[in-house]
Amino acid sequence: MEEDSLYLGGEWQFNHFSKLTSSRLDAAFAEIQRTSLPEKSPLSCETRVDLCDDLVPEARQLAPREKLPLSSRRPAAVGAGLQNMGNTCYVNASLQCLTYTPPLANYMLSREHSQTCHRHKGCMLCTMQAHITRALHNPGHVIQPSQALAAGFHRGKQEDAHEFLMFTVDAMKKACLPGHKQVDHPSKDTTLIHQIFGGYWRSQIKCLHCHGISDTFDPYLDIALDIQAAQSVQQALEQLVKPEELNGENAYHCGVCLQRAPASKTLTLHTSAKVLILVLKRFSDVTGNKIAKNVQYPECLDMQPYMSQQNTGPLVYVLYAVLVHAGWSCHNGHYFSYVKAQEGQWYKMDDAEVTAASITSVLSQQAYVLFYIQKSEWERHSESVSRGREPRALGAEDTDRRATQGELKRDHPCLQAPELDEHLVERATQESTLDRWKFLQEQNKTKPEFNVRKVEGTLPPDVLVIHQSKYKCGMKNHHPEQQSSLLNLSSSTPTHQESMNTGTLASLRGRARRSKGKNKHSKRALLVCQ
């Protein structure tokens, strides 16, 4: 089983990387094993937290925190729509959510990475930088996403949007690492991507016989929520951190008293991410059925109740993007998203169509993936725009905000135009393919039962159309010159998705995501008595 795979199956909360290791942890573990611990350990809960926190800075800093721009570089207004080249709505919806992620967009527009990148081809960070720059600086236009964004993933049919989202995030994480050398996992957790999307879980098992405590800390990039018995995101989070009793056949083998004993297991967030990606588990691996129930999600979410430390103030996140799947099962459907522009206005991004939306409409969707950002981060970016401190996105005083693809390409060889690049596609495909990526995932999870969802075919009455799709009638009939798919579709007659027009629902087809289960890898534990 490869360590670099994004999903290794098993318990979902430990699905990204292997456990933290260091000489300090090994030494502490060995010392605990050698000594007989009293019933109450002198180490407090705060001491254990500090010990774990100290492990991460020891890793080599591949993308120091000061590299993240401190002020916003994004234009205040909404950017471009994305052309659907046939069964690519899942790509477009995911890219729009990433494009309007403030820390990521600001880093891309600062050009920190491309100025030092030596890979030139096959670099996902450089490819995303080119895409985000074009999208944000071409409001009112429709652009074609680069083929390199989905090389090795798209196979001519609709795929799962969340899988593509995390495939892209994982590719950007790997692009932060130097070359193709093997890097330890603590160092991987210091990359730019982990700084933005990453945090740490704490899984704590307390022996009820000797009161010994085992803490395991694991990194995460997204959080999957079981919604079968939940009516809201808050309820799903409460179920996630609810203590689990281990007794009977599931009794815990304690490393302190060296016997099987009843225990209590609790999962909490040890550190919080700047940006939270919450995935609502709506699909079944076995049947492909979808839970079409409404799950409430707030505009502002307090994550403090789910943290390891409860003695601090509120930890408020604000919603800035929602990825939606419209359809009845993973075998058919259409993806679109809602994003919040820097100016604070919400927009519906449905392929080429960009329409203004109200917060009421945003919060009434059957969401698939929710994107939250810490309130302090959002306010900092918003204040810099309101004060007129927006820096030039391309780093030159007289560069036009609507930079052309040719200008970007001349600035740096990594920034490729959206036209096809056979060498880039070939290399990207060789490095990571969908089949290889999915081979690393275990398929032994069960999912919720199927419920039919009614799909509305009209836009809300309060929606203002900013610009309509130039391809609303479909490329097949009116744009024969664009029959060749941007994302390397099959030469056989493909199925083209059409952008949703006002009062018309796009074609529903394709397949959707698989749920993520819980990862039950072996754990390196730090045993402490209390």
Curated annotation (Swiss-Prot):
A biological-process GO annotation: proteolysis
Residue positions of the active site: C89 (nucleophile), H334 (proton acceptor)
Documented EC number(s): 3.4.19.12
Reaction(s) catalysed by this chain's protein: Thiol-dependent hydrolysis of ester, thioester, amide, peptide and isopeptide bonds formed by the C-terminal Gly of ubiquitin (a 76-residue protein attached to proteins as an intracellular targeting signal)
Taxonomy, superkingdom: Eukaryota
EC primary class: hydrolase
Molecular function GO terms recorded: cysteine-type deubiquitinase activity
Ranges of residues in domain USP: 80-375
One GO CC term on file: nucleus
Keywords: Endoplasmic reticulum, Hydrolase, Nucleus, Protease, Thiol protease, Ubl conjugation pathway
Any coiled-coil regions, as ranges: none
Biased composition, class Polar residues, residue ranges: 493-505
Entry-linked PROSITE patterns: USP_1, USP_2, USP_3
Cellular localization per UniProt: Nucleus; Endoplasmic reticulum
Main subcellular localisation: nucleus
Span list, region Disordered: 382-412, 477-530
Comp. bias regions, Basic residues: 510-524
Listed Basic and acidic residues bias regions: 382-392, 398-412
Similarity comment: Belongs to the peptidase C19 family. USP17 subfamily.
Function: Deubiquitinating enzyme that removes conjugated ubiquitin from specific proteins to regulate different cellular processes that may include cell proliferation, progression through the cell cycle, apoptosis, cell migration, and the cellular response to viral infection.
Name by which UniProt lists this protein: Ubiquitin carboxyl-terminal hydrolase 17-like protein 13
Record organism: Homo sapiens (Human)
Lineage per the UniProt record: Eukaryota, Metazoa, Chordata, Craniata, Vertebrata
Gene that this polypeptide is encoded by: USP17L13
